[in-house]
């Protein structure tokens, strides 16, 4: 089965979408029912691309995550149900940690539609899934086996899908060990040459068992260069240098190093006895973990060296006479035997010529070897090359396929070992060509990015295959665009690109490179003067990117956005955008047909734009509104005023400057006419932010509307009951006077207010169960009353609308006017009580901001009280905040709430660390802008010394240099005085093409004033830096950091230096040398110039999604919730199949599917399958997320459980040690997740008889569990029990007894005496007491007589069986099977309720009970519950058949 990786081939780019080549899953499996999924899930080793092929494929095969409301803590969302509008909605896919801030993905779900509409939609979508089964079969298609005969190799037989292209066979051959050295060949069937871009099913006479011949083709100049590049890639295949340097989408994975080979390897290549002693840095009590183990096995990574030098010769290009003899190019080679050769490439192949370094003699050497393959030629002239090449190939094919495929986007390492810099002509050529590596292969040279991006969006999307093709095209082009934009932005900052307005001040310059428009982040034309100057200009591109993301997610046909990427590099922010056709030839004023270019003074509208934006606005909850233009005429808009519409020369309708897509956040704006509520003013709001662009997140608006909808339904239901009761009374009592009726009809305002208050106080989750019933009741009531009393029915809805603050009087309507508080914009005010009433619109925006502080922040904290999936670092914390709709600028308020909760200490610590890192980032950006390129490494190392140490920090620069710096005002190319130059024609366009320009958001030495004054970096000291950090924390987050030196920060907040170093390096893109740093050094600075290895760009962009895969995934999840694991497994396998189809083999989303499939395999009893799938999930997470990413740690813990279940006991320990090391490195030992890992380690060590070690780990786990779950929690009971088991095996029965008593007490109080667990614990106590008494008697005997006299029975210490250890491991990790009958449901319900109440987690009770009750409603007789407590505290119930 060929892995689905998409090949990038030159000619494929001729069409607009540069990706004609698609690889489909080999689906011969489709016909064999369930086998299909295994084929999906167990790719075989030689199926992945590699070498240049991998690069090509990978490049085009970028991955994006679907716009999903990501599950912040990267746990399976398998058993969580999102409640939407009072009915059960789909659970959302876990996006596994998407880019740090802009890209927390969003489900563009229309939340406020009535429950009925949504229910209908859900039905429709599931119907759609079923109706498209036919398409899926078409996708799987049939498998075909063909034989391939190539010169000098055995005939090989391969299995292919009839939907694959002939090109796939090329890729396959270039990847196989025996044929990988060929690049220039064609394939023939009979005597016909096959077309590379034909699908196999269209090839005539191709049937099962046909033989395809490989025929060597003559070389051209281009083919010869491709061949040389391929050879170079094969030789450096094992070398991790590219991954450390962050090029070609290579990245690291260490799973194989840790497991010493493939876990599934049947041939016992791994040593049987694994040393189980934990390394020193893994045992409990480690303060600062070492850095070196982060990258294990660096020494042996490279593999043998085959050649000293392979480079293009200085005799190139061939002179005229030699061209006519067929010479294409000359190469120069130095072999390991120190022999020097000049090689000619001609159309027939490669031969050695007689040139030397001084004399050109292109005639063939004597004896002459002519080889079609350069590898063959080198093998004949160098025996060392031949042996080394074979070794490299063997090691390459032994590696897992996933280790060799390129990742979708570049993953950067924050630490790197000392790398050897080798001679590499191809690398040198790539660095200085402005091409993107493959450009010269593409007809028409540079790519028209805008055309490619828009054309792919226009592809048809009616059927499933069409949608897959469209999404694949969008994904590929987007991935290439991100790569190009990143490379261009670095070139711009490094000074390698000429500006389009070179005469202007360096801050005002704009650039075009490779058809991409670049602008720097400064407020160059006082465009943002009123909004916060450079600070506003710095954040604007990020808000613009948010806007582009949501409009892309809504995907309205006919509405176009620009390709947008925001890159932070060396302290500058660069915005890269695709170019609207014709924009550079026109003045901005002529271009804009919709919106305003001067913040609302002149406003235009356009009917087509109104129509398109109204469609999008429905999903985004944007209220169409009217504003007055300069002539006092009302102009209707369906977006913010800043949003501009430009019709390009291609006739497409583009929108740009989407920075105000969502309404402003009034808590951070000082506005005259806004009075915040008492609670908010007491908390210190409004806080004046340093720019006026703060807006609310889409997730917040959705949560707010959902909350209001639930209240609306409840209030309406209350009124209905009153009405019905009144009706019945009337029926009894006969008619009443109309007066009383009218009285009843308009209840005093106090009542509705009281109801509103009630509705706010009551927990909503439980209520939502009956919401659907309520909706139906209201509908029925309306239809019944339509005849009897329409007035009353309308009155019910009207009252409910008034109570929840709906925009419309008689219908539930929540939409937001993004311009409502914009200064200088004059609104057309509507009548009181209608949706166009400005007062109402303002009230709504205020309510949403208040909801964030009073509802969402407490909800966020309550969610984390259960510690079910706790954030591990700043990135997971940020995602979790974003999923709750909380902006990071509220971090100070979140920390304040956390500081009062001892059970949340770990989160308090992580939040403080994130705040310090972000504050430091702001300062670092201005600091870097004051640094000359010459002094970058000195400046960065000096900054790190000031941040992390108290030792000497003398900057390594001579006095003269410093003096020169002081006198020189222009510090840097991009950092000169601000000029008010009148814009040239092009610069006029930037604010429309590049909506905005940007600037360092940082505060400067003055803590928050203008950032135009660059900091002279040589003057910074540890004291001054920490004072700035404190000022920044107060100014930006309103949080008082009580530390003005690193030592105080470490003791006060419990953070570690390594965590701070990692967080900061990742945030700003620094790569430090991998070595052990002595932070306490008193004599020399901790960081020197040589410790700064590299600086990387930090890239923010949008991740395209795969909608059908997402639908399959969510349907699969709901099946799993109903306990239908097999169906769930099949649906999620199908989702993986589609993801492979769209994104290729490597992608975050694929990783989520793999983890879920592994979990399901394990639950279905197939531990071996679980191990195989989870191994791939680990490699994928390491490669796509990073080797020390929180989700990688999670994958390692899962893998250790499955490898234990497969009998790899020592191996599962090694995996847990790795997970624990990474976790402690990132967030320290004091974390609930460490308790889980320690319990696992302790159990396995116990199973191996290492009782002393086992005890150390379980004691640490117990300490953490007591701290975070409280003395009455189940986690604690289990820890006590594990401790008792270990102590009894050590013969310490007294301690064991005391610990088991604790367990018994907790079980008894939580579960009651009759519960099985309580009874087990009582039995355990009895046995322990018996053994303790025996031991005591023996001891007394010895004390009294000096020897044993009485004949006492021996004491039995039985080591636990592996089966019992596995059961216990399952329990700890939350995989627990319980049999419950229908009658037990009620008992379980009350038990769970009692247990969770004790821990104060009410909302979870409702979820847990709801899922039990729902499932038990569907099943009769016996049911089996899967209580999943480790990651998700949820209960699903499955019917036992």
Swiss-Prot record:
Cellular component GO terms held in the UniProt record: cytosol
Translocase is among the record's keywords: no
Compartments in which it is found: Cytoplasm
Ranges: TPR repeats: 1109-1142, 1235-1268, 1270-1303
Keywords: Cytoplasm, Phosphoprotein, Repeat, TPR repeat
Phosphoserine: residues bearing it: 273
Record carries keyword NADP: no
Primary location class: cytoplasm
PROSITE patterns to which the protein is assigned, alphabetical: CLU
Boundaries of every Clu domain copy: 427-669
Spans annotated as Disordered: 1-79, 106-131, 726-769, 961-1009
Biased amino acid composition, Basic residues: 54-63, 964-977
Biased composition (Polar residues): 8-22
A Pfam family recorded for this sequence: CLU_N
Record field: compositional bias (Basic and acidic residues): 726-753
Biased segments, Low complexity type: 64-79, 106-126, 978-1009
Molecular-function GO terms, alphabetical: mRNA binding; ribosome binding
GO biological process annotation, one example: asymmetric neuroblast division
Listed HAMAP family: CLU
Similarity annotation: Belongs to the CLU family.
Role of this protein: mRNA-binding protein involved in proper cytoplasmic distribution of mitochondria.
Protein's UniProt name: Protein clueless
Organism whose genome encodes this protein: Drosophila willistoni
Gene (name only): clu
């Amino acid at each position: 089965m060929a892995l689905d990786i998409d090949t990038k081939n030159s000619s494929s780019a001729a069409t607009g979408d540069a990706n004609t080549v698609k690889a489909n899953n080999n689906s011969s499996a489709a016909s064999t029912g369930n086998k299909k999924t295994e084929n999906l899930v167990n790719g075989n080793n030689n199926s992945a691309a590699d070498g240049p092929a991998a690069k090509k494929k990978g490049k085009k095969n970028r991955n994006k995550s679907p716009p999903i409301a990501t599950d912040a803590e990267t746990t399976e969302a398998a058993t969580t149900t999102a409640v939407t509008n009072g009915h059960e909605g789909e659970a959302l896919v876990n996006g596994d940690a998407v880019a740090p801030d802009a890209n927390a993905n969003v489900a563009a779900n229309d939340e406020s539609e009535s429950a009925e509409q949504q229910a209908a939609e859900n039905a429709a979508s599931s119907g759609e899934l079923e109706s498209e089964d036919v398409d899926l079969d078409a996708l799987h298609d049939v498998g075909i086996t063909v034989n391939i005969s190539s010169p000098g190799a055995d005939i090989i037989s391969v299995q292919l899908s009839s939907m694959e292209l002939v090109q796939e066979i090329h890729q396959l051959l270039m990847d196989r060990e025996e044929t990988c050295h060929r690049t220039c060949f064609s394939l023939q069937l009979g005597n016909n040459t096959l077309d590379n871009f034909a699908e196999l099913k269209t090839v005539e006479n191709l049937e099962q068992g046909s033989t395809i011949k490989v025929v060597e083709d003559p070389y051209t100049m281009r083919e010869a260069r491709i061949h040389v590049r391929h050879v170079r890639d094969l030789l450096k295949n094992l070398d991790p240098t590219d991954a450390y340097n962050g090029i070609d989408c290579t990245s690291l994975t260490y799973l194989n190093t840790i497991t010493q080979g493939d876990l599934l390897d049947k041939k016992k290549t791994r040593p049987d006895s694994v040393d189980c002693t934990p390394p020193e840095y893994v045992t409990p009590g480690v303060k600062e973990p070492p850095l070196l183990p982060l990258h294990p096995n660096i020494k042996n990574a490279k593999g043998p060296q085959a050649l000293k030098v392979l480079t293009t010769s200085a005799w190139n290009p061939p002179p005229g006479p030699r061209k006519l003899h067929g010479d294409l190019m000359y190469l120069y080679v130095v072999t390991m035997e120190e022999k020097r050769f000049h090689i000619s490439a001609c159309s027939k192949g490669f031969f050695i010529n007689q040139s030397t370094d001084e004399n050109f003699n292109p005639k063939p050497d004597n004896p002459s070897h002519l080889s079609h393959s350069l590898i063959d030629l080198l093998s004949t002239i160098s025996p060392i090359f031949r042996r080394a090449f074979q070794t490299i190939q063997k090691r390459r094919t032994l590696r897992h396929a996933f280790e060799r495929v390129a990742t979708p986007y570049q993953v950067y390492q924050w630490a790197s070992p000392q790398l050897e810099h080798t001679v590499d002509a191809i690398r040198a050529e790539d660095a200085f060509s402005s091409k993107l590596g493959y450009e010269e292969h593409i007809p028409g040279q540079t790519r028209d990015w805008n055309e490619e991006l828009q054309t792919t969006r226009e592809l048809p999307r009616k059927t499933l295959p069409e949608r897959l093709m469209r999404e694949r095209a969008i994904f590929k082009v987007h991935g290439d665009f991100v790569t190009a934009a990143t490379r261009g932005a670095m070139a711009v900052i490094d000074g390698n690109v000429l500006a389009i307005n070179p005469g202007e001040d360096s801050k005002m310059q704009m650039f075009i490179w490779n058809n991409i428009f670049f602008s720097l982040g400064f407020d160059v034309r006082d465009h943002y003067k009123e909004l916060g100057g450079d600070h506003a200009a710095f954040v604007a591109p990020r808000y613009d990117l948010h806007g582009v993301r949501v409009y892309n997610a809504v995907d309205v046909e006919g509405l176009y956005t620009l390709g947008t990427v925001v890159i932070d590099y060396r302290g500058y922010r660069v915005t890269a955008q695709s170019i609207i056709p014709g924009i550079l030839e026109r003045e901005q004023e002529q271009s804009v047909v919709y919106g305003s270019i001067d913040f609302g003074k002149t406003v235009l509208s356009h009917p087509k734009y109104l129509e398109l934006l109204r469609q999008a606005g429905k999903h985004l909850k944007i209220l169409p509104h009217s504003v007055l233009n300069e002539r006092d005429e009302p102009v209707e808009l369906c977006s913010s005023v800043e949003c501009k519409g430009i019709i390009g020369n291609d006739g497409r309708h583009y929108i740009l400057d989407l920075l105000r897509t969502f309404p402003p956040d009034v808590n951070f704006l000082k506005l005259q006419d806004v009075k915040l509520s008492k609670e908010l003013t007491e908390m210190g709001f409004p806080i004046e932010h340093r720019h006026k662009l703060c807006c609310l997140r889409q997730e917040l608006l959705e949560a707010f509307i959902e909350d209001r909808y639930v209240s609306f339904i409840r209030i309406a239901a209350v009124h209905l009951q009153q009405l019905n009761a009144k009706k019945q009374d009337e029926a009894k009592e006969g008619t009443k006077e109309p007066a009383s009726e009218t009285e009843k009809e308009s209840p005093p305002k106090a009542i509705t207010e009281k109801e509103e208050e009630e509705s706010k106080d009551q927990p909503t989750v439980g209520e939502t169960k009956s919401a659907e019933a309520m909706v139906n009741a209201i509908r029925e009531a309306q239809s019944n009353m339509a005849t009897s009393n329409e007035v009353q029915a309308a009155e019910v809805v009207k009252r409910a609308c008034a109570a929840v603050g709906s925009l419309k009087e008689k219908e539930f309507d929540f939409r937001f006017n993004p311009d409502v508080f914009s200064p200088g914009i004059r609104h057309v005010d509507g009548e009181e009580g209608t949706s166009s009433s400005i007062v109402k619109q303002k009230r709504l925006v205020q309510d949403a901001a208040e909801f964030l502080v009073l509802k969402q922040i407490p909800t966020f904290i309550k969610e984390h009280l259960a510690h079910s999936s706790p954030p591990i670092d700043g990135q997971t914390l940020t995602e979790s905040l974003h999923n709750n709709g909380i902006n990071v600028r509220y971090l100070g308020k979140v920390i304040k709430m956390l500081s009062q909760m001892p059970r949340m200490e770990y989160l308090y610590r992580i939040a403080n660390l994130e705040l310090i890192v972000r504050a430091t980032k702001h300062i670092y950006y201005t600091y870097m802008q004051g640094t000359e390129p010459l002094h970058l490494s000195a400046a960065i190392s000096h900054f790190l010394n000031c941040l992390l140490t108290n030792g000497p920090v003398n900057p390594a620069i001579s006095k003269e240099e410093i003096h020169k710096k002081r006198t020189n005002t222009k510090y840097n190319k991009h950092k000169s005085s601000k000029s008010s130059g009148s814009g040239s024609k092009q610069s006029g366009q930037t604010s429309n093409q590049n909506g905005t320009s940007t600037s360092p958001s940082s505060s400067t030495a003055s803590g928050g004033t203008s950032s135009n004054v660059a900091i002279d970096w040589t003057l910074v000291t540890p004291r001054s830096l920490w004072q700035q950090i404190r000022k920044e924390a107060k100014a930006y987050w309103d949080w008082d950091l009580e530390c003005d030196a690193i030592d105080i920060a470490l003791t006060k907040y419990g953070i570690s230096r390594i965590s701070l170093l990692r967080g900061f390096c990742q945030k700003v893109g620094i790569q430090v040398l991998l070595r052990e740093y002595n932070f306490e050094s008193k004599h020399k600075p901790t960081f020197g110039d040589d410790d700064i290895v590299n600086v990387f760009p930090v890239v923010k962009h949008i991740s395209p999604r795969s909608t059908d895969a997402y639908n399959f995934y969510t349907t699969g999840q709901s099946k799993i919730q109903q306990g239908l694991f097999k169906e769930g497994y099949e649906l999620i396998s199908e989702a993986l199949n589609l993801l492979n189809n769209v994104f290729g083999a490597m992608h975050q989303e694929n990783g989520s599917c793999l983890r879920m499939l592994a979990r399901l395999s394990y639950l279905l009893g197939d531990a071996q399958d679980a191990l195989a799938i989870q191994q791939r999930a680990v490699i994928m997470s390491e490669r796509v997320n990073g080797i020390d990413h929180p989700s990688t740690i999670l994958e390692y813990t899962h893998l250790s459980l499955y490898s234990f279940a497969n009998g790899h006991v020592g191996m599962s320990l090694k995996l847990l040690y790795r997970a624990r090391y990474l976790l402690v490195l990132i967030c320290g030992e004091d974390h609930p997740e460490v308790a889980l890992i320690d319990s696992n380690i302790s159990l396995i060590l116990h199973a191996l008889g290492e009782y002393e070690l086992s005890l150390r780990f379980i004691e640490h786990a117990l300490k953490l569990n007591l701290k975070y779950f409280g003395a009455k929690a189940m986690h604690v009971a289990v820890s006590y029990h594990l401790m008792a088991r270990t102590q009894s095996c050590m013969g310490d029965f007294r301690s064991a007894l005391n610990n088991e008593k604790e367990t018994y007490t907790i079980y008894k109080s939580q579960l009651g005496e009759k519960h099985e667990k309580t009874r087990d614990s009582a039995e355990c106590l009895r046995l322990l007491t018996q053994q303790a008494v025996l031991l005591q008697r023996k001891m007394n005997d010895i004390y009294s007589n000096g020897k044993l006299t009485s004949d006492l029975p021996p004491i039995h210490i039985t080591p636990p069986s592996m089966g019992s250890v596995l059961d216990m491991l399952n329990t700890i990790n939350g995989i627990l099977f319980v049999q419950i009958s229908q009658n037990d449901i009620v008992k379980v319900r009350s038990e769970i309720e009692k247990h969770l109440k004790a821990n104060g987690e009410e909302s979870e009770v409702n979820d847990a009970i709801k899922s039990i009750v729902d499932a038990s409603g569907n099943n009769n007789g016996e049911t089996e519950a899967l209580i999943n407590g480790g990651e998700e505290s949820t209960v699903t119930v499955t019917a036992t058949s």
